């Protein structure tokens, strides 16, 4: 029994020892795994330490470079101070030289004035001598005239004495001469036209009807619509867009153009084109041209030399066909009125109407062509002239006065409807003048002629020289031009062969010349006769801008003799004073803009200084504050100069804060380095202690199994404590590793650099 119990006890002990052995082997394997892990962590920490050392070296090099740059900045500031001193000295010297130059110029001007005065004195003396000489010459001329008269009288006396001997012979001859002269006079009287025949010829060669310019009215509703049209032009893209504020185009189309053209009754035009033709004419997308250039030589009023001479000349050919060739026409009927006669040239369809369409590229393409007779040609051309004139007002070729729809009051309407009035006696003749003219037909033989004949002085002014009823503003002149074009349109509807036959005046705008010394005096463009306009047409018309002249090439805005207007001096003075005030305001605004630009450049220069670059190492809060300060500074720069100063003060206040934050960051980096070193040393000591404990446990197990059983619990406790300590240290190392701190600082540096770039 005892042996069996001992065997059981031994077997139990063996099993327990085997289990302990297995557990110890497992623990040993587990410890070896932990050892490998710890070795790996140590290797990874060594790489991190190397990266940290390299970054530290880079930081030191950057710090040195910054110090070098600071030294350079100081040196440059010293150089700037020296240059400023030199500049002040140079400015002082320049001021001295300017004063000397001013003194020299003053002395030169004094000498020049003295020379001019001497020259004028000499000129005055020479003029007096010339006057005396001219008077002497006149006296000599009168003497010569008297002597020549005396000689003529003497010659007559001599001839009379010579002819006394032959009086008898000359008497017969004289009778025959009288008979011949009588017959010739009778025949000539028969040939001379009477006053009645001359009057009849003048009547049938004159103008049918043409109203004078002074009879044009400015108090009708259509003129008010014209003023609204002028006021709405600057705000609209084209003249069709003015229909919302003015009824001018609508009334012109409905009351005058549509009844004359009768597009709805046109047989040769499609219904789609009928709807869009007037809008195309308003936009200027219509072309009226002859089928051949030779057709222009067959129109009424065309004057040219003989075609044979032109054919034999060496001049270049203007037309495809020779000048003596017949005109080119179309057999098709007119698209508007249906004219189909071919009996005379005037009834032929020698012209065509082309409708255009604008492509996406801005080019114009021909969509339709329609033949035109002479009657419809004049009507269409005149409608195109009317809308081209309205488009020229939109371009600004007529230099219209500024007018707004809100300011169209009764006073403004009176201002733009005023015309020139009589300023003298309207050509009336006094009763005393009539008496003197009745009493004698010879000059100076009337009653009290010596007392009645008084010297007259001519006053050259627009008020005295201008006829009554003339326009005083460019808006009135534009209205006159529109009335003239409308009148021609009505005459084309009545039926005429030519348009330019009865045009006796050309109307143009008032043009202000900036080169004149007196800018308040306006220059008026006078209405002139056709003969004067032809003489003055050779002179070029000076427009205010090249673009307006290019756009208004189809119209004649040529002016004749220019006269200064005195009637609008008060308005011109007010406008000039307003213009000067606006000029001053614009100059002040421009100076403020320049100062704001200068301040913005200085603020940008301050922000890009090396001090701001040095302060680029900050956290996220620093970058957000910088962005907000930059935005506020930019807003203040755009608003006013005071805002610029505030923005610069904000940026300057941020600079010391950045320096403090930089120092804090450097201290934090140093603390992290010390903590990392201490923790790594502690980890190494703890790991070595754990290794020694494991080795001691293994040796003790191999030496004696009994001792292992007794020390089992103690070894397990120590191993657990060591493992927990190692895990905690690894977690702390992972949390406090330098890589994470460096990444955070680098991200903050990037954010700060972005903020600096924005600033």
Curated annotation (Swiss-Prot):
<feature type="coiled-coil region">
    <location>
        <begin position="26"/>
        <end position="164"/>
    </location>
</feature>
<dbReference type="GO" id="GO:0051286">
    <property type="term" value="C:cell tip"/>
</dbReference>
<feature type="compositionally biased region" description="Acidic residues">
    <location>
        <begin position="555"/>
        <end position="576"/>
    </location>
</feature>
<feature type="compositionally biased region" description="Polar residues">
    <location>
        <begin position="690"/>
        <end position="703"/>
    </location>
</feature>
<dbReference type="GO" id="GO:0005085">
    <property type="term" value="F:guanyl-nucleotide exchange factor activity"/>
</dbReference>
<feature type="compositionally biased region" description="Polar residues">
    <location>
        <begin position="731"/>
        <end position="744"/>
    </location>
</feature>
<comment type="function">
    <text>Guanine nucleotide exchange factor for SEC4, catalyzing the dissociation of GDP from SEC4 and also potently promoting binding of GTP. Activation of SEC4 by SEC2 is needed for the directed transport of vesicles to sites of exocytosis. Binds the Rab GTPase YPT32, but does not have exchange activity on YPT32.</text>
</comment>
<feature type="compositionally biased region" description="Low complexity">
    <location>
        <begin position="577"/>
        <end position="589"/>
    </location>
</feature>
<feature type="compositionally biased region" description="Basic and acidic residues">
    <location>
        <begin position="704"/>
        <end position="719"/>
    </location>
</feature>
<dbReference type="InterPro" id="IPR040351">
    <property type="entry name" value="RAB3IL/RAB3IP/Sec2"/>
</dbReference>
<dbReference type="GO" id="GO:0043332">
    <property type="term" value="C:mating projection tip"/>
</dbReference>
<dbReference type="GO" id="GO:0030435">
    <property type="term" value="P:sporulation resulting in formation of a cellular spore"/>
</dbReference>
<feature type="compositionally biased region" description="Low complexity">
    <location>
        <begin position="597"/>
        <end position="612"/>
    </location>
</feature>
<comment type="subunit">
    <text>Interacts with SEC4. Interacts with YPT32, preferentially in its GTP-bound form.</text>
</comment>
<keyword id="KW-0344">Guanine-nucleotide releasing factor</keyword>
<dbReference type="GO" id="GO:0005934">
    <property type="term" value="C:cellular bud tip"/>
</dbReference>
<protein>
    <recommendedName>
        <fullName>Rab guanine nucleotide exchange factor SEC2</fullName>
    </recommendedName>
</protein>
<dbReference type="GO" id="GO:0015031">
    <property type="term" value="P:protein transport"/>
</dbReference>
<dbReference type="GO" id="GO:0070273">
    <property type="term" value="F:phosphatidylinositol-4-phosphate binding"/>
</dbReference>
<feature type="compositionally biased region" description="Basic residues">
    <location>
        <begin position="648"/>
        <end position="664"/>
    </location>
</feature>
<dbReference type="GO" id="GO:0005829">
    <property type="term" value="C:cytosol"/>
</dbReference>
<feature type="modified residue" description="Phosphoserine">
    <location>
        <position position="515"/>
    </location>
</feature>
<keyword id="KW-0175">Coiled coil</keyword>
<dbReference type="Pfam" id="PF06428">
    <property type="entry name" value="Sec2p"/>
</dbReference>
<feature type="modified residue" description="N-acetylmethionine">
    <location>
        <position position="1"/>
    </location>
</feature>
<dbReference type="GO" id="GO:0006914">
    <property type="term" value="P:autophagy"/>
</dbReference>
<comment type="similarity">
    <text>Belongs to the SEC2 family.</text>
</comment>
<keyword id="KW-0653">Protein transport</keyword>
<dbReference type="InterPro" id="IPR009449">
    <property type="entry name" value="Sec2_N"/>
</dbReference>
<keyword id="KW-0007">Acetylation</keyword>
<dbReference type="GO" id="GO:0042802">
    <property type="term" value="F:identical protein binding"/>
</dbReference>
<dbReference type="GO" id="GO:0032120">
    <property type="term" value="P:ascospore-type prospore membrane formation"/>
</dbReference>
<feature type="modified residue" description="Phosphothreonine">
    <location>
        <position position="168"/>
    </location>
</feature>
<feature type="compositionally biased region" description="Acidic residues">
    <location>
        <begin position="750"/>
        <end position="759"/>
    </location>
</feature>
<keyword id="KW-0597">Phosphoprotein</keyword>
<dbReference type="GO" id="GO:0030133">
    <property type="term" value="C:transport vesicle"/>
</dbReference>
<feature type="region of interest" description="Disordered">
    <location>
        <begin position="538"/>
        <end position="759"/>
    </location>
</feature>
<feature type="coiled-coil region">
    <location>
        <begin position="651"/>
        <end position="682"/>
    </location>
</feature>
<keyword id="KW-0813">Transport</keyword>
<keyword id="KW-0968">Cytoplasmic vesicle</keyword>
<feature type="modified residue" description="Phosphoserine">
    <location>
        <position position="171"/>
    </location>
</feature>
<dbReference type="GO" id="GO:0006887">
    <property type="term" value="P:exocytosis"/>
</dbReference>
């Amino acid at each position: 029994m005892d042996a069996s119990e001992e065997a059981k006890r031994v077997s139990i002990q063996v099993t327990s020892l085997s289990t302990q052995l297995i557990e110890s082997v497992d623990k040993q394997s587990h410890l070896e795994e932990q050892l490998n892990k710890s070795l790996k962590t140590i290797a990874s920490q060594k790489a991190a330490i190397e990266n940290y050392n390299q970054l530290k070296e880079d930081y030191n090099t950057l710090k040195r470079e910054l110090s070098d740059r600071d030294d350079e900045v100081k040196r440059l500031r010293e150089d700037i101070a020296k240059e400023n001193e030199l500049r002040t000295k140079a400015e002082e010297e320049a001021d001295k030289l300017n004063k000397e130059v001013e003194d020299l110029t003053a002395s030169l001007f004094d000498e020049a004035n003295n020379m001019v005065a001497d020259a004028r004195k000499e000129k005055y003396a020479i003029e007096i001598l010339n006057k005396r000489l001219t008077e002497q010459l006149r006296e000599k001329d009168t003497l010569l005239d008297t002597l020549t008269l005396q000689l003529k009288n003497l010659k007559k006396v001599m001839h009379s004495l010579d002819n006394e001997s032959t009086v008898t012979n000359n008497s017969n001859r004289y009778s025959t001469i009288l008979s011949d002269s009588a017959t010739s006079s009778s025949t000539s009287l028969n040939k001379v036209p009477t006053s009645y025949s001359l009057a009849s010829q003048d009547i049938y060669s004159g103008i049918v009807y043409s109203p004078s310019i002074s009879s044009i009215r400015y108090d009708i509703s259509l003129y008010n619509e014209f003023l609204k049209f002028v006021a709405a032009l600057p705000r609209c893209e084209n003249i069709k867009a003015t229909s919302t504020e003015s009824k001018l185009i609508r009334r012109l189309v409905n009351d005058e153009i549509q009844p004359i053209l009768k597009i709805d009754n046109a047989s040769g035009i499609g219904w789609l084109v009928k709807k869009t033709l007037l809008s195309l004419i308003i936009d200027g997308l219509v072309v009226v041209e002859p089928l051949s250039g030779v057709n222009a030589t067959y129109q009424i009023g065309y004057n040219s030399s003989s075609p044979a001479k032109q054919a034999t000349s060496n001049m270049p050919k203007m037309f495809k066909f020779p000048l003596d060739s017949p005109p080119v026409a179309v057999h098709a009927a007119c698209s508007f009125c249906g004219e189909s006669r071919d009996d005379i040239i005037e009834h032929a369809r020698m012209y065509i109407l082309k409708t255009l369409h604008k492509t996406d590229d801005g080019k114009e393409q021909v969509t339709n062509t329609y033949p035109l007779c002479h009657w419809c040609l004049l009507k269409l051309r005149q409608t195109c002239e009317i809308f081209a004139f309205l488009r020229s007002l939109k371009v600004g070729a007529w230099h219209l006065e500024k007018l707004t729809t809100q300011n169209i009051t009764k006073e403004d309407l009176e201002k733009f409807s005023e015309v020139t009035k009589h300023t003298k006696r309207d050509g009336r003749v006094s009763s005393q003048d009539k008496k003197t003219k009745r009493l004698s037909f010879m000059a100076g033989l009337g009653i009290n002629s010596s007392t009645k004949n008084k010297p007259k002085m001519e006053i050259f002014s627009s008020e005295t020289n201008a006829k009554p009823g003339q326009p005083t503003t460019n808006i009135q002149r534009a209205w006159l031009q529109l009335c003239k074009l409308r009148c021609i349109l009505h005459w084309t509807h009545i039926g005429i062969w030519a348009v330019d036959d009865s045009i006796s005046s050309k109307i143009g705008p008032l043009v202000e010349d900036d080169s004149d010394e007196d800018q308040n005096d306006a220059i008026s463009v006078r209405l002139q006769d056709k003969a004067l306009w032809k003489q003055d047409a050779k002179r070029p018309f000076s427009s205010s801008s090249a673009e307006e002249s290019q756009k208004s090439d189809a119209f004649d805005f040529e002016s004749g003799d220019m006269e200064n207007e005195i009637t609008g001096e008060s308005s011109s003075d007010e406008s000039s004073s307003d213009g000067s005030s606006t000029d001053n305001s614009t100059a002040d605004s421009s100076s403020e803009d320049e100062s704001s630009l200068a301040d913005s450049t200085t603020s940008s220069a301050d922000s890009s200084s090396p001090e701001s670059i040095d302060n680029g190492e900050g956290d996220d809060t620093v970058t957000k504050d910088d962005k907000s300060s930059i935005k506020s500074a930019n807003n203040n720069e755009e608003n006013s100069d005071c805002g610029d100063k505030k923005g610069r003060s904000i940026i300057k206040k941020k600079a010391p804060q950045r320096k403090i934050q930089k120092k804090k960051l450097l201290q934090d980096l140093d603390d992290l380095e010390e903590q990392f070193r201490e923790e790594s040393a502690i980890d190494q000591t703890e790991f070595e202690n754990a290794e020694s404990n494991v080795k001691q446990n293994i040796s003790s197990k191999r030496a004696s199994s009994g001792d292992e059983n007794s020390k089992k619990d103690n070894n397990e406790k120590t191993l657990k404590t060591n493992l927990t300590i190692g895990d905690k240290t690894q977690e702390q190392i992972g949390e406090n590793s330098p890589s994470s701190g460096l990444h955070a600082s680098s991200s903050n540096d990037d954010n700060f650099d972005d903020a600096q770039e924005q600033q």
